[in-house]
């Protein structure tokens, strides 16, 4: 629980809400500007492919924020002398709760959160440093 609290504090301290909103607005504005142009580029931007591109930008940015908040949470645990292995354990439980299923490449790319198993592995590696 302490690791999750540290993770969530990380979102606040790292300004993720504002930067996520800014990225979403910029991606949307960019796609709409491209869609308003003539030719193949405009047609692609206005199509479902353009929507997919926008979703990809937003989800990858979100995954990056989740990773940096994981790092913040682990540093929080270390700083306060808490068991750093607890974060790995939490992500292993999350992976098990999802049936241990790994999504396909596209599912993983469009997810707002990194794969919990990969997050657990990363936390294990960082805790051992």
PLM region spans:
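A Zn2+-metalloprotease active-site environment signal
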Residues: 1-129
């Amino acid at each position: 629980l302490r690791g999750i609290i540290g993770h969530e504090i990380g979102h606040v301290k790292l300004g993720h809400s504002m930067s996520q909103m800014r990225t979403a607005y910029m991606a949307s504005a960019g796609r709409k500007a491209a869609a308003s142009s003539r030719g193949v580029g405009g047609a692609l931007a206005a199509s479902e492919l353009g929507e997919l591109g926008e979703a990809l930008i937003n989800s990858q940015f979100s995954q990056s924020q989740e990773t940096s908040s994981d790092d913040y949470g682990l540093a929080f645990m270390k700083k306060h002398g808490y068991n750093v292995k607890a974060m790995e354990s939490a992500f292993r439980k999350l992976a098990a709760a999802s049936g241990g299923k790994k999504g396909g490449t596209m599912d993983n790319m469009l997810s707002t959160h990194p794969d919990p198993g990969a997050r657990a592995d990363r936390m294990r590696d960082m805790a051992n440093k």
